[in-house]
Amino acid sequence: MADVKKNCLASLSLAPISKAQQAQVGKDFYKFFFTNHPDLRKYFKGAENFTADDVQKSDRFEKLGSGLLLSVHILANTFDNEDVFRAFCRETIDRHVGRGLDPALWKAFWSVWVAFLESKGGVSGDQKAAWDKLGTVFNDECQHQLAKHGLPHL
């Protein structure tokens, strides 16, 4: 657990959460996401045809990106505290109930996240493995919470 946290945190230097950088890094994630995964834009009502330029100008994606970045930092920082980590996973699902997300996306997100980090700089093999482990545990808890809500789950 400690190695997973250590390696995830080390790679987060590529996605800083400082006051000066959080908003832009969050927008950068969604620009990367919309450019590389246009099929997933359908989950963002009103932004189904957004380009990276549209994301850059969007207050909505500034807020979404900042929130996503904060969530990823919280997950990495709490990975060695299983109760807090899993509670945050459940709360994440609770915030997304009713959005009709494909349950496979809760695991798939992490490969997109690693690819985003790689676009910002070098990510080591140990760091990739750490994100995969974190994503696996995250997904496991998310699938249990989806089931609790009676939603499709894997």
Swiss-Prot record:
Q: Which GO terms describe its cellular component?
A: cytoplasm
**Gene3D superfamilies in the cross-refs:** Globins
What cystine pairs are annotated?
none
Keywords, ordered alphabetically? Cytoplasm, Heme, Iron, Metal-binding, Oxygen transport, Transport
In this protein, which residues make up the domain named Globin? Answer: 1-147
**GO MF annotations for this entry?**
heme binding; iron ion binding; oxygen binding; oxygen carrier activity
Where does it reside?
A: Cytoplasm
Pfam families noted in UniProt: Globin (PF00042)
Check the UniProt entry and state the signal peptide residues, or none.
none
Report if keyword Cytoplasm is assigned: yes
Q: Which InterPro entries match?
A: Globin (IPR000971), Globin-like_sf (IPR009050), Globin/Proto (IPR012292), Globin_nematode (IPR012085), Mb-like_M (IPR044399)
**Which positions does UniProt annotate for heme b binding?**
96
Give the family this protein belongs to, as stated in its UniProt record.
Belongs to the globin family.
Any remaining note in the record? The globins of the nematode parasite N.brasiliensis have oxygen affinities 100-fold higher than the rodent host's hemoglobins. Two isoforms are found, one located in the cuticle, and the other in the body of the nematode.
- Tell me what this protein is called: Myoglobin
According to its UniProt entry, this protein's organism is Nippostrongylus brasiliensis
**In the UniProt record, what gene is named as encoding this protein?**
GLBB
